[in-house]
């Protein structure tokens, strides 16, 4: 997968560069894509900076609270924690791609491979953990709640998700390199046919979008039906959260995967022979994948901050921090009269 606007997942040959999405050596006329590169130099660094700041703040808060304050965790807590970790690692690759868009790849061949693989691992694992959360919410609402806490199966599922994502990143580790134009791009041996390239593209779409989406859609649909039938409970807030989660997933992920699928079809049948159309496809992949990765910034809001208990806990932490600041000021003013006033930490649930 990797960042396709900086390094296409179509696995083009050596003569391709950063934003080229087709090997135009097969055509009589060379397609010059200077406008696409200029757009990338402006759009990508600006968008990545915004995504990095917002995503780092939200996901770091989630990880810190789960790691240091909430010791007793449910299955959903474990999935959300893994999701936040995946989102953080994904966000940490963005500064490298921002520099790559402007100055080219300056960190060498090994870092090109590692950064590309990290992007794929955490993008794919994030989508899978979203599916895990929906499955757990389905079981929590429609079946009898488990009394055993997290349990071994939950950790096995997390392990399998990470392993699957790592396996999907193998093409990045093997084929990504720095070309003669200082771009971190995939360079495949010539004997690998278009069917192999398209197969990898389709596999990424299936694992990174179709499978998680189908799981989420089915689980949340059944969960919503069950909630509606339940008497004497407040239904508006849970249903609103379910609806928001599904809509945000569709809005952020569907456009990118549609463009990605069009690329895969073009790899097989070479449908795009017009230079202007190829440029529009390149810009489309830049914009849609940026929107797709922005989902990592929204996950803390959708899965954590919308929970009343979590918001209450944040308020308690803020009050405790304010009390600590006032105490520090009193210590500086009247050090011999200071006391260590503490407040017990309470747990919360999603």
From Swiss-Prot:
Expressed in circumvallate and fungiform papillae, olfactory epithelium and lung. Lower expression in liver, kidney and tongue epithelium bearing no taste papillae. Very low expression in the cerebral cortex of the brain. Residues 67-79, 136-153, 223-241, 307-350 are cytoplasmic. This is Atypical chemokine receptor 4. Glycans are attached at residues 6, 19. The Ser/Thr residues in the C-terminal cytoplasmic tail may be phosphorylated. The lineage of its organism: Eukaryota, Metazoa, Chordata, Craniata, Vertebrata. The keyword Manganese does not apply. PROSITE patterns: G_PROTEIN_RECEP_F1_1, G_PROTEIN_RECEP_F1_2. It is found in: Early endosome; Recycling endosome; Cell membrane. Belongs to the G-protein coupled receptor 1 family. Atypical chemokine receptor subfamily. Atypical chemokine receptor that controls chemokine levels and localization via high-affinity chemokine binding that is uncoupled from classic ligand-driven signal transduction cascades, resulting instead in chemokine sequestration, degradation, or transcytosis. Also known as interceptor (internalizing receptor) or chemokine-scavenging receptor or chemokine decoy receptor. Acts as a receptor for chemokines CCL2, CCL8, CCL13, CCL19, CCL21 and CCL25. The gene is ACKR4. The chain crosses the membrane at residues 42-66, 80-99, 114-135, 154-175, 200-222, 242-265, 284-306. Forms heteromers with CXCR3. Interacts with ARRB1 and ARRB2.
